[in-house]
Regions:
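An acidic intrinsically disordered interaction segment
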Residues: 49-76, 119-133, 171-179, 214-233, ...
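N-terminal secretory signal peptides
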Residues: 1-16, 23, 29, 39
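Aromatic-lined, polymer-binding surfaces characteristic
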Residues: 107-109, 124-284, 296-319
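CBM-like carbohydrate-recognition segments
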Residues: 67-80, 84, 88, 139, ...
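C-terminal segment of classical bacterial N-terminal signal peptides
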Residues: 31-34
């Protein structure tokens, strides 16, 4: 049970807030997506336009989720597209928390950025307020948008994505919350402890939540984290790749979840316990190798192999490469200009095709346009917002090398253009 709420503190009038949200969102999105969806683009000289494109796409993807939940209208306004053969219960029970948790995890690094001047600063302040209000709505039993954290297994996944986002933006999203909202949110996250995760990447979801508890200064279960860390160590297949459970699968779950979650958990708990200190250097070396592999998966035109499940996560397949860029931890073979250009090419191929968004700006199922047959039974509209994780490099300042270095062809584009490059090298011994 959540604690009984009282009136939220220090929250402006709802009608005035909604008016500011709508007007601000319209102005931010006015430029719309770049034209020429699906074209192969030649790298351009570095300019403010590179970052502006990423910001524009982040606003287009994330603004509807945050603005509607902040004002208690997410359930009323977000459609829930799901396969006819959806799993054991309606996806509408889960889809809204999916959308929120994944959106916050993608936007969090940018929201934590401390650059007090300029147009981005004003947008960041507005979005921080949106997330604060959304967290209040999501955990308030009196809200029409009180989200499901405790019924079924799926909420464990997206509570973990929300915890991940709060870890990446603790100063801007968690610390300023009123004590009442913090208490409700902690109770909601604790309610996921009743879910028994399957023996695969799901072990990282309760581990991420327990890590957040540790960082938030409340009681946490070290054994839950240890189980996830030890299991993935046992499932390591070599050359930077983990099994999703004991067996290997051709899919993008090393990027969707495994590498970014495992690295974040170990980074955040470093200094709180030395239990896994010896593992972190190995985990980081593997993460570097997998980032190099991901960069090589980007085709000359920004496409990538449509392998495995959850392809409707679109450019979220490159969460790990984006996360390594945000961490300033790209491998030596991948320059910031390569990573920025390659990720932007993937974004264009997966977010710009006709049919990607509905008339009201909500994502639709597909990889390149509207392709509902690609959806597994667990996919619904909220699931699709995992694509937002590609925006994590926006957490780097505008003056960082990632944004200022010259644009560069990524590996496949160079090789298929005839460039003479050294061979790829496997990671051995880790």
């Amino acid at each position: 049970m959540h604690p009984k709420p009282t009136a939220a503190q220090n929250l402006p009038d709802r009608r005035d807030f909604l008016r500011r949200v709508v007007v601000g969102g319209m102005l931010a999105a006015a430029a719309g997506p770049a034209a020429g969806a699906g074209e192969a683009r030649a790298p351009a000289s570095p300019s403010a336009d590179d970052r502006a494109y990423w910001l524009r796409m982040m606003r287009r993807v994330c603004e509807p989720v945050l603005s509607h939940l902040a004002t208690g209208t997410l359930r009323a306004q977000m459609p829930v597209e799901a396969p006819a053969a959806a799993a054991d219960r309606p996806r509408s029970d889960f889809s809204h928390l999916e959308a929120f948790g994944r959106t916050v995890a993608g936007a969090a690094p940018w929201l934590e950025l401390e650059e007090p001047e300029g147009a981005e600063a004003a947008d960041r302040a507005r979005w921080r307020e949106l997330v604060h209000r959304a967290l209040n709505q999501a955990t308030n039993p009196a809200s029409p948008d009180c989200l499901n954290f405790s019924r079924g297994g799926q909420p464990l996944v997206d509570a973990a994505f929300l915890a991940y986002g709060l870890l990446l933006a603790r100063k801007s999203l968690w610390d300023p919350l009123p004590a009442e909202v913090k208490a409700r949110l902690l109770a909601a996250l604790r309610s996921t402890r009743d879910v028994a995760p399957p023996n695969n990447n799901w072990l990282l979801f309760p581990a991420m939540i327990e890590t957040f508890f540790a960082v938030a200064g409340t009681s946490w279960r070290e054994d839950v984290v240890d189980r996830a860390v030890r299991a993935h160590e046992a499932w390591y297949q070599g050359d930077g790749t983990y099994g999703d459970g004991p067996e290997f699968h051709w899919d993008y779950y090393n990027s969707y979840v495994i590498h970014p979650f495992l690295e974040t958990i170990l980074r955040e708990l470093r200094g709180r316990t030395d239990r896994w200190a010896s593992l972190l250097p190995r985990v980081l070396r593997r993460a570097g190798r997998y980032a190099a592999v991901q960069e090589r998966l980007v085709g000359p035109d920004g496409t990538f192999p449509p392998l495995g499940r959850s392809l409707a996560y679109r450019c979220g397949a490159f969460h790990h490469l984006a996360h390594q860029a945000f961490r300033d931890a790209l491998p030596p073979a991948v320059t910031p200009g390569q990573a920025r250009s390659g990720l932007a090419a993937v974004m264009r191929r997966t977010l710009e095709p006709e049919g990607t968004f509905d008339a009201d700006g909500w994502l639709r199922v597909g990889l390149a346009g509207h392709q509902p047959s690609l959806a597994e039974p667990y996919i619904s509209t909220g699931s699709l917002y995992l694509c937002a994780l590609v925006f994590q490099p926006l957490g780097l300042p505008a003056a960082h090398r990632f944004w200022c270095d010259g644009s560069a062809d990524w590996t496949q584009r160079r090789i298929w253009s005839g460039a003479d490059l050294p061979p790829d090298q496997a990671l051995k011994g880790d």
